[in-house]
Amino acid sequence: VKVILAGAGAFGRKHLDAIRQIGGIEVLSVVGREPEATRSVAASYGIPHSTTQLGEALARPGVEAAILCTPTQLHAAQALECLRAGKHVQVEIPLADSWTDAEAVAALQKETGLVCMVGH
């Protein structure tokens, strides 16, 4: 499975550490807020691309899924962006910071048939 990971902070690094232990997963890009810090995380995990733009990472060739380890207030909007881009998505808890936003994500997931899961 070829994935991108959004969130180059502590939770993102925990996910990257876990991914190292699982066969068959290739991280194609890391997305973060600070370019230098994001480049550093990508380099330390051998990830070939880093960016500050989720859309740029989602558009990379071969990307099948996204892992979102970003601040809560970004979860719903980013999950919707991933689904609209045709990618499966795993979101750190909570899925959204409002019921309305959570319902919007659930509705788009049903419409697309893609996997949208909340991990903890």
Tell where the protein language model's regions lie, with residue ranges.
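Short hydrophobic "strand-cap" motifs at the C-terminus of beta-strands
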Residues: 6, 92, 119
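Rossmann-fold dehydrogenase core element
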Residues: 104-120
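Residues at the C-terminal ends
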Residues: 21, 84-86, 111
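Short, well-ordered coil/turn segments that N-cap beta-strands
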Residues: 25, 64, 87, 113-115
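N-terminal Rossmann-like dinucleotide-binding module
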Residues: 1-45
